[in-house]
């Protein structure tokens, strides 16, 4: 049986209306066990200022972003279940959901799925990688009972 341990950190000022720990756990459980049996993941919910600082420091982008993924790399020869950290910016997630006319819960779920796949080594730098990652995201989101998060983009193509 797989086990995903969640460390949820609420580092944003307003906690009202945030998904609860059980929801974050369900979303992680919908992704990670497909790829590995045991994992520990920290999800830190932050405000725009912290997201902006981290995005600038680690990605050179001078703005807040929806989700940042920081995979943990154990020293050679040491097996650890620590997968890494997801930093999710509440304001950006809420703004994107509204702009994209997506249910807020579904967008939160998508950010956890997307970030978790990054922790597992997936990326979207080139078109082939993006297609593979988006296909996995869609499959996982549908399996959890949500719509395809890329449906609007597919309709306009």
UniProtKB/Swiss-Prot annotation:
Look up the record and name the cofactor or cofactors this protein needs. Zn(2+)
Q: What does the record note about the cofactor? A: Binds 1 zinc ion.
Is Nucleotide-binding a UniProt keyword of this protein?
A: no
What the entry lists under Pfam families is as follows: YbeY
> Where's it found, cell-wise?
Cytoplasm
**Major subcellular site:** cytoplasm
Q: Which InterPro entries match?
A: MetalPrtase_cat_dom_sf_prd, YbeY, YbeY_CS
Disulphide-bridged cysteine pairs: none
Protein's name according to its UniProt entry: Endoribonuclease YbeY
Organism of origin: Salmonella paratyphi A (strain AKU_12601)
């Amino acid at each position: 049986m797989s086990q995903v341990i969640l460390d949820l950190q609420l580092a944003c000022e307003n906690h009202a209306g945030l998904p609860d720990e059980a929801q974050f756990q369900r979303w992680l459980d919908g992704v990670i066990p497909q790829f590995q049996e045991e994992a520990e993941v920290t999800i830190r919910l932050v405000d725009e200022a912290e997201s902006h600082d981290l995005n600038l420091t680690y990605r050179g982008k001078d703005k807040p972003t929806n989700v940042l993924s920081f995979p943990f790399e154990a020293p050679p020869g040491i097996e650890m279940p620590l997968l890494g950290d997801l930093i999710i910016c509440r304001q950006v997630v809420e703004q994107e959901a509204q702009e994209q006319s997506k249910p807020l819960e579904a967008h939160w779920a998508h950010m956890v799925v997307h970030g978790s796949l990054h922790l597992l080594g997936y990326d979207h730098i080139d078109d082939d990688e993006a297609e593979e990652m988006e296909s996995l995201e869609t499959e996982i989101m549908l399996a959890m009972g949500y719509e395809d998060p890329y449906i609007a983009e597919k309709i306009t193509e």
